[in-house]
Amino acid sequence: MIDIHTPILMLDCETTNDIDCPFVYDVGYQIFTLADGILCEKSFVNADIFLDPELMASAYFADKIPQYWEDIKNGKRTLRKWFNIKKELAEDCKRFGVVYACAHNASFDNRALNTTQRYQTTSKFRYFLPYGITWLDTLRMARQILKDNEDYGRFCYENDYLTSRGCRRYTAEIIFRWLSGSADFEESHTGLEDVKIERQIFEFCLAQEPNIDGRLWRD
């Protein structure tokens, strides 16, 4: 059971290159507790990747690049080198005593962050998150909570949110459409904005089952 005073790092990243070797150009995060809410919130654009036109040409959401520049200009996001992003996140984790990191489909975020770390340091440093932080996965949690939920099942079938094998889908966008009652909600696919909805999914899952095991890797 996660104590309501336990600090949690919720993060999301956007990537370029290919799915097997993703490089992070956008990372947003919140540090929060269930009792106190948001303690820290930041949005970074990785200058080492974002300023490389060849790498960014393959970004799935490359059409958002002009908006990123506008956000950087108005202070909504901070353009910073990867080394400094990692350093600041580590300092925030230490300052607030972060125990868990969480993402929706956390295995991808973990792989993308570590792949970028190895690329940027030529594998001198291999892991992005500070040692000792445990990964939680809201995708795993949502599957446990919603797999037998009749209302969510009906919502998926009525809107054709199904896999090729006819099973319910559990993307953050679909889950949040159901949670919010907003059928036309579209995920931003920018780091910090996606963090905000994924935190609500996390809190919903814990409200349904406080003892849920959301760990990405289990002992």
Which residue ranges define each predicted feature?
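Conserved non-catalytic scaffold segment of RNase H-like nuclease domains
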Residues: 2-116
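Conserved protein kinase catalytic core
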Residues: 18-20, 143, 200
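A short, structured active-site edge motif that brings together acidic residues
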Residues: 45-50, 128-146
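Short, polar/flexible loop-turn hinges at active-site or ligand-entry regions and domain interfaces
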Residues: 71-76, 122-129, 182-188
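Acidic, Mg2+-coordinating catalytic module of metal-dependent nucleases/exonucleases
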Residues: 100-107, 111-112, 154-219
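Substrate-recognition/cap helix-loop segment adjacent to the acidic, metal-dependent catalytic center
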Residues: 108-136
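Short alpha-helix plus adjacent loop in nuclease-associated cores
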Residues: 136-163
